Amino acid sequence: MKYSIETYKDNIALINVDNEKGLKATLVSFGAGVYELSFNDHPVILTLKEIDDYLYSSQYYGKTLGTVAGRLKKDGLIDGNEYHLIPESGQNFALHGGMLKSISYKNWDYKIKESNKKLDVIFSITTRNNEGGYPGKVRIYVTYSFLKDKDEFKIFYKATTPSDAVFCNLSNHMYFNFDTHDISDYYLKMNVDQVAITEPNLLIIDKEKVPAHLDFNKAAKLNKRMDYIEKHDFKKTIDDTFIFSSMPGKITLQNADVKLDITTDCSSLNIYVDNSLTPINFKAHDDYSLRRGIALEPQRFILNKDEIILHKGEVYKNYIDYKFKAR
C-alpha cells in the first residue's frame, strides 16, 4: 500500500492512495470526497478535469453529502421544536445540507492510520449551530478504508452531537462510469421493493411498490429502462429513492469489463443518472454522451424522521462497501 499527500491552495489536501493491486484513489479534504478512482488503470468514476471545478461544482462529484443527504422540507419540527432551513432557490426544501454552504463545500481535518492490512483516511468536521438553518452542532467522521489485498474500499460514517436533537443523514455522490462514453449498456441489480413517491419538485411524501420500469431486482440493462423513462417520466432520467427489501442492501453495477458490488446498512438508495450534456470538462473523456454517469447514494430513508434525527448521547453509524472485479 502506498500513499502520498499533496497540498493544494487554502490548505486543501489531496491524498493519493494505491493499494498496489489494482485500486487507486485521490481523496480531497475539501468535501471529504473522492476526486479520482481507478481500477486496473481505468477510471471508474467521472472526474472533472480541474480541481477548482470539483471544489465548487453544484453536481457534488464524489463528495460527502450532509448533514442531510437528499431533500428536507424547509420548515418543520424536530422533537417539537421549530426549524427553518435556507431552501434552494424558489423551492420549499434544502438539498444535501444546503447548496454551496454544506459540509460538501468545507475543508475537513484529516488523519491517516496504516496497519499491515489496510489504510484508513479519516476526515472530521464539526458543524455550527443553525448553519443553513439546521439546528444544533454535529461532529462528523468519514473514514475511507482501503484493503491491501483486495480491490475493495469501505466508507464508514460516524456522528455525535452535544445538542438535544439534530438531523443527520450522510452519503457519497460519486458518479460511476467504467471508462466508457456512456452507461447505456451497463446492467444494474439491487434488492429493493419500494420506491419513494414525490411531489413534482422531488420532495418525498410517501412510498409505493416499485413499478416495472424501475424494478432492478433482476439485472436489467439501463438503456432499456432509460428509453422508457425518457418517453414517460417528466424527469427524463432516473432520480429516485429506493427502499431496500432486506439488509444489507446490495447493489451490482456491471458492464463487459468491470463489476462493482456495493453493500450497505443504509435503509435506502438514491439513484441519479446524469442524462444531460451540460458543458463540463472531464479528465478521462471530452466526448461523453447522454447517460454519462450514475450516482448510487446509499442513505437513510429521509421520510422516516426517526432514522435521520440524532440525539445527545447517541452515535450515528453507517457504512458503504465497494468491491471491484474484472470480468
Q: Residues of each region from the PLM?
A:
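An exposed, glycine/acidic-rich loop-and-rim segment of catalytic or binding clefts
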Residues: 1-327
